[in-house]
Amino acid sequence: MKLSVPETISNPRDFLHTSVPQLTDLDSLLRCHICKDFLKASVLTPCGHSFCSICIRKYLQKESKCPLCLSDLTESMLQKEFLVQEICSSYVKLRGSLQKHLTISSQEEEKDNEIIISDEADTSVGTKRGTPDSPSLSSVSTKKRKHDGITTLLMKKKTDHPQRQEKKAQCPICSKHLPLSELEGSHIDECLNKGSSLERSDSFEILDERTPSPSMESSHQPLEEKTSLPSSHLLEVKEKKDITYHNERYLNSGLLQQKENRLPRLDFQSLSMTQLKQKLASLALPSNGTKQQMVARYKHYEMLWNSNFLDSIDPVDENELKRRLSSWEAKHNTDHSSDSNSITNLLRGNKRTNAISAMIKLFKSDRFDRKGWMRHHTSTFKALKLEAQRSDKLAKMKKEELSQKSDANSEVSSEPILKIDQTSENN
């Protein structure tokens, strides 16, 4: 009796042997982690994980916890995800075409898997490489062997090229950048011998050590497994991690601990200007402008804060949030953006105070940077100089005004005396 087996069983690893192996990550993300098939009627949990509706409901009948992060979960907490469902359905329709167009053809695969193993005889010291009558060329015997699996991404048929300027490439085993001549020599064999005792993952297994044929063992000449290693055809260690980076980050998202609390909404009608300014100051935000502008500033920062620290899988720090707020305020809340209390100036001020405090620590030592101190305070010195010149001018102007007034008063006071003298003479 034969069991009925589906004709095709899809697997995220189907894309490992294509020209875009990173699609493995996308394929895994669109699958339910209970049934391992593509999401159907996707629902979202409060902890941010997606499952098929029927799968998670069956699971919750046995245990009231999220299968991935073990957070408390009930059916009433599940939310519909129409967008994810449509994305998944669209991908399922395109998956076959993607795999067909991106899969490397069998002929190219055979060419890429071929390794030329050359057995070179020892030559005399004076013999030059590449001469027509060189004994090494006559004693070379080649044998082609095929590798399967992930090695299609690691190996390429060796072609004879004239010797050019020495180039470097990255070793797929130890990830070191070495000259091609060294990599084509015994370096890879040494790396494989060292790493043969280490455990390797099923998805990214590097070349297995192969035992040479008896005919090759009989000749007491060194064997060299040669392969050209251009960086464009190597699956580097970084790229291997990138293939499953998003999927692993999603699976580990439940382990992330929420460090920051939710920023609450405020009842702005009941808050006075003083209370609102105190609230902004407690968040290290500027408290300038009208009440309407301060309310808009707080609302936008509240939105940035909660979406970053509560919903993002990769949150940024507070300084980045304040930079985003500054950018938003420059476009939508510009009346007081140039004030000394604006966000941009506050951020700049923090950097300046840090630099000044570092200088002050060295003020009494020989390491004090006097020129740096002068450069840092050049604008302040200029402002003080201009202010002193203005005050000097004002003082001179006041003196002149006072002297002019005193002269005018003396002239006015002398006129009645002259009149009195004239009247006395007439009498």
From Swiss-Prot:
Pathway connected to this protein: Protein modification; protein ubiquitination
UniProt keyword Disulfide bond present: no
Domain SAP: residue ranges: 268-302
E.C. designation(s): 2.3.2.27
Zn-finger (UBZ4-type) residues: 168-196
GO biological process: one example: protein monoubiquitination
Entry keyword set: DNA damage, DNA repair, DNA-binding, Metal-binding, Nucleus, Transferase, Ubl conjugation pathway, Zinc, Zinc-finger
Domain of life per record: Eukaryota
Zinc finger (RING-type): 32-70
InterPro entries referenced in this protein's UniProt entry, alphabetically: Rad18, Rad18_fungi, Rad18_UBZ4, SAP_dom, Znf_RING, Znf_RING/FYVE/PHD, Znf_RING_CS
SUPFAM superfamilies in the cross-refs: RING/U-box
Acidic residues compositional bias, start-end: 113-122
Pfam families (UniProt xref): SAP (PF02037), zf-C3HC4_2 (PF13923)
GO molecular function, one term: zinc ion binding
Polar residues: compositionally biased ranges: 212-221
Region of interest: Disordered: 113-170, 202-228, 392-427
GO CC annotation, single: nucleus
Biological function: E3 RING-finger protein, member of the UBC2/RAD6 epistasis group. Associates to the E2 ubiquitin conjugating enzyme UBC2/RAD6 to form the UBC2-RAD18 ubiquitin ligase complex involved in postreplicative repair (PRR) of damaged DNA.
Self-association and partners: Interacts with E2 UBC2, forming a complex with ubiquitin ligase activity.
Protein name as annotated: Postreplication repair E3 ubiquitin-protein ligase RAD18
